[in-house]
UniProtKB/Swiss-Prot annotation:
GO biological process: cytoplasmic translation
Binding site for Zn(2+): 17, 20, 36, 39
Name of this chain's protein: Small ribosomal subunit protein uS14
Gene Ontology cellular-component annotations: cytosolic small ribosomal subunit
GO MF annotations in UniProt: rRNA binding; structural constituent of ribosome; zinc ion binding
InterPro entries with a match to the protein in the record: Ribosomal_uS14, Ribosomal_uS14_arc, Ribosomal_uS14_CS, RIbosomal_uS14_euk_arc, Ribosomal_uS14_sf
Gene name linked to the record: rps14
Organism from which the protein derives: Methanococcus maripaludis (strain DSM 14266 / JCM 13030 / NBRC 101832 / S2 / LL)
Cofactor stoichiometry and binding remark: Binds 1 zinc ion per subunit.
Family: Belongs to the universal ribosomal protein uS14 family. Zinc-binding uS14 subfamily.
Cofactor or coenzyme needed: Zn(2+)
Function according to Swiss-Prot or TrEMBL: Binds 16S rRNA, required for the assembly of 30S particles.
Binding partners and assembly: Part of the 30S ribosomal subunit.
Length: 53
């Protein structure tokens, strides 16, 4: 009998990037983005975010 992997319902492991599927603490969920920080940096200009000095 093998163990079946269970789906995490809460915590950092339950949040995934909707673009690349990466898990962990680098997920940006504000405004319903659900992107990891690397994907967010690539898409931010297209989404209308501006980088200020």
């Amino acid at each position: 009998m093998t163990k079946t992997p269970f789906k995490t319902k809460y915590g950092q492991g339950s949040k995934v990037c909707k673009r690349c599927g990466r898990k962990g603490p680098g997920i940006i969920r504000k405004y319903g983005l659900n992107l990891c920080r690397q994907c967010f940096r690539e898409l931010a200009p297209k989404l209308g975010f501006k980088k200020y000095d």
